[in-house]
A protein has these predicted regions:
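A short, N-terminal "cap"/entry segment at the start of jelly-roll beta-barrel domains
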Residues: 1-36, 120-127
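Conserved short histidine dyad/triad with adjacent acidic residue
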Residues: 40-55
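Well-ordered beta-strand scaffold positions
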Residues: 42, 67, 75-77
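Short beta-strand His + acidic residue motifs that chelate non-heme Fe in jelly-roll/DSBH
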Residues: 50-52, 70-71, 87, 93-99
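Glycine- and acidic-residue-biased ligand/ion/polar-headgroup-sensing regions
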Residues: 57-59, 63-68, 73
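Short acidic-glycine-tyrosine-enriched beta hairpin
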Residues: 75-89
Length: 127
């Protein structure tokens, strides 16, 4: 079992080409004995974004703070606190902070990370 306050885990820059002002912390993952999912918290600066990308695994997102737009395929959707997002496998997606304060969201991804290289996993802060 693990009980931790998110702010006790340092934020690390997302080191993937196309990421702007994006940081991540791995809250719970395989290293903690979680057999099925990794829970990450992202923080994106105003005007920042995650890279536009796709991968073989799904993920689920829950917006905690800020306003954003998510691009999924050719559609863009506005996000606000309390919004949940399901990103299916192999769909091109990107999260952009459209507000004037930091965007914070939780992102859950499954194990194993099908289609995600170890380099990409490390760049997202969850080795």
């Amino acid at each position: 079992m693990k009980v931790v306050h998110c702010e006790s885990i340092p934020l690390a820059p997302v080191q993937i080409e196309g990421a702007v002002g994006a940081k991540v912390r791995c809250l719970i993952g395989e290293q903690d004995g979680a057999p099925s999912f990794t829970m990450r918290q992202f923080e994106i600066a105003p005007g920042g974004c995650t890279p536009k990308h796709a991968h073989a695994h799904e993920h689920e997102v829950f917006v905690l703070e800020g306003t954003a737009a998510v691009l999924m395929g050719n559609a863009e959707h506005a996000l606000q606190p309390g919004t949940a997002v399901f990103v299916p496998p192999n769909v091109v997606h990107q999260f952009r902070n459209t507000g004037s304060s930091p965007l914070k969201f939780l992102c859950l991804i499954p194990h194993p990370l099908r289609g995600m290289s170890q380099t990409c996993v490390a760049a997202c802060g969850c080795e």
